[in-house]
């Protein structure tokens, strides 16, 4: 038997018992011939002591991360030597038998949570990820992830959902983000694609009458490198038949409530909702951080007749930085550099003195009437600073949205342990293709319009008859869940009629012929009594990183990729041999399909 107990579970009531522990040498100390070892296993640490001369001689050879088994008697630590920072700190194991299960070479870095993780480069940590996972913080991250999986499953199974696996080898639909392609050896010149999401298959499951589906799904996107993105990621995927938006949101809130309970936090429900239009108007983002109460104030009408050329723009907006008037000039100059790094020309400002008098470059260039009224208009008090952005509404609001977050950080308005959730609903169904980024399953078509979420999102009922006549005004039957400024999930009521789906494709510039070639199986399925259905997908990596307080999703993935999609541990991706290339049929030309007469 390798063990009778776990190291971190030994307590005072075990005193006098003979136990066997197995684990790793976390720390070794010699004190006058007596050797002390901190033994680590998955449960934590226990102090083991080698006093017997024979086992002490054997223990003399132990080094960090040796894998060992020890048997001995649990003793109470001598008075005054207890360790209150250790769960097992009231006891020690007096060893009478030691077995070295495996030795360890010199470590590339110390496995010690007390030292700053920043002292070890991430590339090194990922190259030796199996050692990095022995650190308590990394171990606990994966345990948390497992617990979160179980909590979500429990909620869904209680509501009669079925956990169903969908294919990971499917057909490429190149209108979205780039697919990872897999050569089909038995059909030379043809390729599978790894799925960017289970979207189409879960809709087909609804057509198939499963009614309630979920899956902790692996998804793949061959995107250009962006910070804190992974080429393979996980989402909790949920789909339901015969539901409306409120039904899906209700189940989603129950899932969120269950998983946040894993860290001891009760989410107040129902979670508030705001429209996409209000999110952009007041927060400059479709994923607003509501942990602090700073709102954008529109000033376009206020400056409608201004002589100040900077404000002679389609949009003028402002935010207020409380007590910001006392900032030194170098800090105000730093704000300009900050704005320019985001593609803006700068960040105009007015300082409101303690006496209410205005100063700064903007104050000198606006009219007396504007000077008299601007502080009241934006809600600024003596001692505050008003920041402005002017230009087109989208980019100006985005700049002010970023600025409100920066102001909150500088003023210490974001408190550790604060959580703020909101649903963002009624997003546009389409956006101009020039403004789009390919993030959905079918994000880009060939026309002036592309889908904001994806091409299978239903228009809102009131837009059903007009969305293809006036795409710019159409609203989607979609809902995104936002936590602390992070979009952690998104879903929609889906299109379940083939005629509506084809109309959406047409708005996106996807012809009937192209739609039939790429999505004919879905369009055909919709003709066989497809039910109304909808669902949601949660970004599982992001959620677990938020729950655990991690800066990066890489910390909550067992074996993540580093920048550029490289795995330092296995050195993937790697070249293949000429034989593999030939056998896979990568370079073969696909056979033309025979046309039927």
UniProtKB/Swiss-Prot annotation:
Stated role: Aspartyl-tRNA synthetase with relaxed tRNA specificity since it is able to aspartylate not only its cognate tRNA(Asp) but also tRNA(Asn). Reaction proceeds in two steps: L-aspartate is first activated by ATP to form Asp-AMP and then transferred to the acceptor end of tRNA(Asp/Asn).
Enzymatic reactions: tRNA(Asx) + L-aspartate + ATP = L-aspartyl-tRNA(Asx) + AMP + diphosphate
Similarity field: Belongs to the class-II aminoacyl-tRNA synthetase family. Type 1 subfamily.
Alphabetical list of InterPro entries matching this protein: Aa-tRNA-synt_II, aa-tRNA-synth_II, aa-tRNA-synth_II/BPL/LPL, Asp-tRNA-ligase_1, Asp-tRNA-ligase_1_N, Asp/Asn-tRNA-synth_IIb, AspRS_core, GAD-like_sf
GO CC annotations, alphabetized: cytoplasm
Region of interest: Disordered: 562-597
Gene: aspS
A Pfam family annotated for this UniProt entry: tRNA-synt_2
Residue ranges of the region described as Aspartate: 199-202
Residues noted as binding ATP in the record, renumbered to the chain: 221-223, 230, 487, 539-542
Domain of life: Bacteria
Biological process, per Gene Ontology: aspartyl-tRNA aminoacylation
Subunit and interaction comment: Homodimer.
Compartments reported by the entry: Cytoplasm
Site (Important for tRNA non-discrimination) location in chain: 31, 80
One annotated GO molecular function: ATP binding
Protein name as it appears in the record: Aspartate--tRNA(Asp/Asn) ligase
Keywords linked to the UniProt accession: Aminoacyl-tRNA synthetase, ATP-binding, Cytoplasm, Ligase, Nucleotide-binding, Protein biosynthesis
Organism of this sequence: Corynebacterium kroppenstedtii (strain DSM 44385 / JCM 11950 / CIP 105744 / CCUG 35717)
NCBIfam families attached to this UniProt entry: aspS_bact, PRK00476.1
Ranges of Basic and acidic residues composition bias in the record: 579-589
EC number: 6.1.1.23
Broad class of where this protein is predominantly found: cytoplasm
Positions with a binding annotation for L-aspartate: 175, 221, 453, 494
